[in-house]
């Protein structure tokens, strides 16, 4: 549904160049909620503005719903008819609402339909339908100043849906909201994704947003995508920065002659007493140094940091037992020799 290839954006000012996007390749499948996460300055907002060509990319291509927007844009400063038509399939939700204070809630939602030349009757019908969809049917005649932050964002979402888009872009839509309101807006986005079949690309710096509603995610740093995939794939990837950030665990070894493991479990494995089975089977004392568990996409997923007595070479068999149970195991304090042994064990398990 959304594909970027070699997407590059360079800003030039007073003889200086700043590269905001550096060859970004991204693919968002139809009907999924895709989160792009990263710190301030990572290039997230530049990415989403290039996806709908609010910013013209310096290089690379953007394809949305089968249309190559970069080809449609041409070289002129203004958008042509074909590009405007392609953009009509894209809705945008902003961080700061951008509602017109002199217009009622209904009139704000009707604004895109006015621009499209729809009749007053059609505009009114569509706006009221959308306000009901976002839970604001009783606020149609209110003004933005009379609304809470969460209600304003709901109006922004309704306005973004006025043109019946196939894709919804969300640029930090919850960052100015309190935690409870954030949860309600995220649930609304997920409901719209399911009810309308919307493809949602959202930009955020909050890990909880990714955990709450995202099917897939990408981590950006300094204008590049450093990791991407489904949340499940990322959690199963050894050494994944995004997985570690989604489920952070801490704790250091109590001595040099100890093995520290990060254990990632999900699905059925999350409900099995694997650690106690390991302790009984091999008659070893296991220390739990840290743990985090949550529900992602309806599945229980968690990470645990445990300590085993003895060096890694002494624990190859117990580690193999854990991997046989379908768990992802990362050895935190392994030496180069232990790393080689660990890699060999993974290969054996894959045969």
UniProtKB/Swiss-Prot annotation:
GO terms for cellular component: plasma membrane. It is a peripheral membrane protein. ATP binds at residues 38-45. Keywords: Amino-acid transport, ATP-binding, Cell membrane, Membrane, Nucleotide-binding, Translocase, Transport. It catalyses: L-methionine(out) + ATP + H2O = L-methionine(in) + ADP + phosphate + H(+); D-methionine(out) + ATP + H2O = D-methionine(in) + ADP + phosphate + H(+). One of its GO terms (molecular function) is ATP hydrolysis activity. Its EC number is 7.4.2.11. Coiled coil: none annotated. It is found in: Cell membrane. The keyword Membrane applies. Residues 2-247 form the ABC transporter domain. InterPro entries: AAA+_ATPase (IPR003593), ABC_transporter-like_ATP-bd (IPR003439), ABC_transporter-like_CS (IPR017871), ACT-like_dom_sf (IPR045865), MetN_ABC (IPR041701), MetN_ABC_transporter-like (IPR050086), NIL_domain (IPR018449), P-loop_NTPase (IPR027417). Part of the ABC transporter complex MetNIQ involved in methionine import. Responsible for energy coupling to the transport system. The complex is composed of two ATP-binding proteins (MetN), two transmembrane proteins (MetI) and a solute-binding protein (MetQ). Belongs to the ABC transporter superfamily. Methionine importer (TC 3.A.1.24) family. This is Methionine import ATP-binding protein MetN. It comes from Streptomyces coelicolor (strain ATCC BAA-471 / A3(2) / M145).
